């Protein structure tokens, strides 16, 4: 295993490939030459509706509410978020299994807004956030949201909404 490998690490590089060798292990990869895309163009700059809450509270509420859609023939697990004064209402509607909703206390005192997301993507993002608190910035129901770990503002996620 890699943990047991001892000795020197040899690195070889040519125009097309890079090779890293240590012990009995060799890793060979193709070298890609190109310009990294300008990701700043997809990061929204004017999301003015912000709310924050506990990361685990949000993740657990999404998980509970989206359970209504489990095992359905759905392309995605759409969840609706409705924000109003210090409240976040999460809801899922299933054609065969009914309706589920849950309300969370959040820090929010701006205009009401309603937006839909894929619940799986929201849970995946919550799982990647290390901090206790999460911040979500929204412009409107059709623009991407920015989701940030409040303890690490260098790490953020851009999530496209869904029509519900």
Task: Please annotate each region the language model reported.
Residues 33-41:
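Active-site loop ensemble at the mouth of alpha/beta enzyme cores that anchors a bound cofactor
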Residues 1-32, 47-164:
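DNA polymerase processivity clamps
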């Amino acid at each position: 295993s890699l943990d047991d490998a001892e000795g020197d690490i040899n690195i070889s590089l040519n125009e097309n490939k890079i090779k890293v060798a240590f012990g009995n292990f060799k890793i060979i990869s193709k070298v890609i030459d190109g310009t990294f895309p300008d990701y700043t163009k997809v990061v929204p700059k004017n999301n003015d509706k912000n709310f924050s809450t506990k990361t685990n509270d949000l993740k657990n509420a999404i998980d509970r509410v989206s359970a209504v859609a489990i095992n359905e023939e759905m392309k995605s697990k759409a969840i609706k978020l409705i924000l109003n004064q210090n409240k976040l209402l999460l809801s899922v509607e299933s054609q065969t299994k009914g309706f589920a909703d849950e309300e969370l206390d959040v820090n929010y005192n701006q205009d009401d807004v309603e937006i839909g997301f894929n619940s799986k993507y929201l849970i995946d993002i919550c799982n990647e956030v290390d901090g206790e608190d999460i911040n979500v910035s929204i412009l409107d129901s059709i623009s991407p949201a920015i989701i940030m770990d409040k303890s690490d503002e260098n790490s953020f996620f851009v999530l496209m909404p869904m029509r519900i």
